[in-house]
């Protein structure tokens, strides 16, 4: 599989730097393992204030769509997703103003908010390009938004992935709990098409079939969360004390999810074929702890 990626809501290129292990200014310009075939970065302001896009282009250059046009600094809602080059991985830290600590949970509008609706641009991209893999990032509050209907917004996201034929893993990760010098809790979402070899390997590894009894299915999904899933090796966890795997079904229609669905999502979980498996986990990290003093310049 070619390592081709599309980066939405790109900022100054955080996902691109991570995928290609770009750590210093000297790393820019080196051959990248992942070929970024297209990206999008746009702020709803005057053209002269597109600082993040300007920085991205300064470091990495721009990309053209299949019509030979540069639409990387257009409102993503106005971009025809069918014109994007093909890619195998879609990444993005989609706008999260409505979920973040910048506003209280009680007043959060979630997917109904001005920027929250940009989730639908991600869904349009999934429909148009059908990438086999997706990696997204948002604030941890996403799992509980909005206050009046806890879990609705994340339920809508999962239902959209289900309808496009994806299995989804998620994990709330705090960088400080894995040795880094910043307390930063974020929800990471990894989705993969059900017809990929990766999906087949995961199911075979955890021993899952669609004919298993519920208790055996829960054991398989717990194995995926704790040992065999996408996040398990890099960000190891243990089951929290007295934690149990909870199961909940998504309504068939996305509209019904939006109107009635509620779920007490835990910090780890999997959704497969519309069934949600979620459990509370705790970090299992015993390595070096980097402090702020280790990275600050002195003198």
For each predicted feature, which ranges?
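Terminal non-domain segments
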Residues: 72-75, 164-167, 199-204
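Conserved hydrophobic/aromatic beta-strand scaffold that supports enzyme active sites
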Residues: 91, 170-172, 188-190
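Conserved S-adenosyl-L-methionine
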Residues: 140, 166-177
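Core alpha/beta nucleotide-donor-binding catalytic domains of modification enzymes
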Residues: 1-133, 139-155, 159-162
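Short glycine-biased active-site loop of nucleotidyltransferases that positions the nucleotide triphosphate
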Residues: 82-84, 179-182
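S-adenosyl-L-methionine-dependent DNA methyltransferase catalytic core
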Residues: 1-36, 160, 186-299
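Short, conserved secondary-structure transition motifs
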Residues: 42-44, 176-181
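Residues that flank catalytic or metal-binding motifs in active/ligand-binding sites
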Residues: 157, 169, 183-187
């Amino acid at each position: 599989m070619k390592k081709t990626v599309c980066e939405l809501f790109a900022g100054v290129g955080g996902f691109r730097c991570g995928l290609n292990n770009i750590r210093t200014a000297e790393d820019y310009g080196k051959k990248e393992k992942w070929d970024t075939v297209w990206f999008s970065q746009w702020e709803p302001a005057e053209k002269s204030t597109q600082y993040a896009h300007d920085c991205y282009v300064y470091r990495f250059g721009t990309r053209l769509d299949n019509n030979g046009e540069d639409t990387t600094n257009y409102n993503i809602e106005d971009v025809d997703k069918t014109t994007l080059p093909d890619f195998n991985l879609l990444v993005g830290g989609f706008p999260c103003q409505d979920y973040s600590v910048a506003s209280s949970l009680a007043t959060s509008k979630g997917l109904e908010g001005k920027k929250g609706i940009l989730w639908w641009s991600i869904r349009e991209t999934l429909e148009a390009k059908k990438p086999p893999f997706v990696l997204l990032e948002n604030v941890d509050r996403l799992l509980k938004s909005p206050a009046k209907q806890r879990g609705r917004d994340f339920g809508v996201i999962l239902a959209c992935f289900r309808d496009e034929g994806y299995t989804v893993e998620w994990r709330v990760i705090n960088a400080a709990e894995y040795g880094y010098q910043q307390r930063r809790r974020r929800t990471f979402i990894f989705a993969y098409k059900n017809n990929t070899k990766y999906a087949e390997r995961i199911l075979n590894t955890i021993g899952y079939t669609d004919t298993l009894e519920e208790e055996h299915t829960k054991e398989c999904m717990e194995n995926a969360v704790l040992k065999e899933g996408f996040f398990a090796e890099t960000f190891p966890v243990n089951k929290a004390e007295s934690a149990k795997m909870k199961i909940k079904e998504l309504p068939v229609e996305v509209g019904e999810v939006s109107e009635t669905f509620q779920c007490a999502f835990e910090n780890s979980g999997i959704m497969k074929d519309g069934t949600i498996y979620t459990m509370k986990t705790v970090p299992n990290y015993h390595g070096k702890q980097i402090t702020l003093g280790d990275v600050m310049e002195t003198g």
